[in-house]
A protein has these predicted regions:
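Charged, low-complexity surface segments at secondary-structure and domain boundaries
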Residues: 1, 13-17, 28-29, 43-44, ...
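Accessory DNA-engaging acidic/polar modules
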Residues: 10-13, 24, 50-57, 70, ...
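Short amphipathic alpha-helical segments that mediate assembly, nucleic-acid/protein binding
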Residues: 4-8, 26, 38-39, 68, ...
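Charged, compositionally biased N-terminal leader segments and the immediate start
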Residues: 1-21, 95-99
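Amphipathic alpha-helical binding modules
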Residues: 61-102
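Amphipathic alpha-helical packing elements
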Residues: 15-64
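A general marker of short, structured functional hotspots
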Residues: 3, 20-22, 32, 77, ...
Length: 102
């Protein structure tokens, strides 16, 4: 099991990779990470998405570019960090990133 510091490092690496690969900056999330910490920022992001039932605004960008691996929701599902999240948060992320049959 990894701790919050490791999660923070992984999130910052994902944000950096996203910026380099897809030119997506995760700017609002970065601001929240600075203000509240990585775990709280991601939980806040998930709460907003779950309450509005809207896809994250970056979803289409990453899906169209075949880079779903750059979604924060995939980091939530990482076995090293899944214990940091509620069952509801994990289920939401799993539903979001699981490919649907045509």
């Amino acid at each position: 099991m990894m701790n919050r510091d490791s999660f923070t490092n992984s999130l910052l690496s994902l944000i950096s990779a996203s910026r380099k690969i897809s030119r997506y900056t995760y700017q609002p999330l970065q601001a929240e990470v600075s203000r509240y910490g990585a775990l709280t920022a991601v939980k806040n992001m998930l709460s907003r998405s779950m309450s509005t039932l809207r896809l994250p605004k970056d979803y289409d960008l990453f899906w169209l570019n075949g880079r779903m691996d750059l979604l924060v929701e995939n980091l939530v599902l990482d076995p090293r960090y899944v214990h940091l999240f509620t069952a509801e948060e994990v289920a939401f992320c799993r539903e979001l990133v699981t490919p649907k049959a045509a």
